[in-house]
Amino acid sequence: MIFENYKLKNITLRNRIVMAPMTRNQSPGGIPTQEVIAYYSRRAKAEVGLIITEGIEVSHEASSAYPNVPRLDSIEAKEAWKKVVEGIKNNNGAVIAQLWHCGGFRKLGMQPNPEVPGHTASGLVKPGKKVAHEMTLDDIKETIDAYASDAKICEEIGFDGVEIHGAHGYLIDNFFWSGTNIREDEYGGSIENRSQFVSDLSLIHI
């Protein structure tokens, strides 16, 4: 069964083998290199049915926390991702982009916006440790808009879908945890409210 074709909504996969997202830190300036393009093509050529890309930083000023992670907010980056997608599809693979906001893992001084601190639900990176910027409602809207914009770009580039990174203490996960989300508005309190941010993300239309 694992090697049989599989219908995933509007995508037909040649098998049920999926490559998980793995950060590679090989995209200086946020632009995937020729080596990155070749890397993904090789995986498709080896008959991986579905490839989920490494985390792509959302086009938001506070999304980054690590060097040489790819982005979508430049012409050069978009063109490079088009080549990644073409390489995968030319080898009969399918590909989903993973969008990633690092939240409180970001520190002042990090590129590409060294003056911008990390953003979290309540300014906390762990219970009692407030070292980040507490997101306002405007910040939350801007972040959701950034996800929506990047999802649209992914569609235009030719990705088969988008996955949103929601684990490991990054921004979305930070909203889920009662120890790091002590907000008193519609995005904090009950688990339903702490899930409101990701719920809003899931409802974006592109």
Question: What positions do the PLM features span?
Answer:
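Active-site glycine- and acidic-residue-rich loops that bind
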Residues: 30, 144, 187-200
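Short coil-to-beta-strand
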Residues: 14-17, 48-57, 117-122, 161-175
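Alpha-helical packing segments of well-folded alpha/beta enzyme cores
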Residues: 39, 80-84, 139, 143-151, ...
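The substrate-binding groove and active-site-proximal loops of carbohydrate-active enzymes
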Residues: 67-75, 132-141, 189-192
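Glycine-rich, proline-tolerant flexible connector loops at the mouths of alpha/beta enzymes
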Residues: 53-76, 101-111, 164-188
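Conserved small/polar residues in nucleotide/adenosyl-binding loops
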Residues: 204-206
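Non-globular sequence segments
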Residues: 100-159
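N-terminal capping/small domains of soluble enzymes
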Residues: 1-102, 143
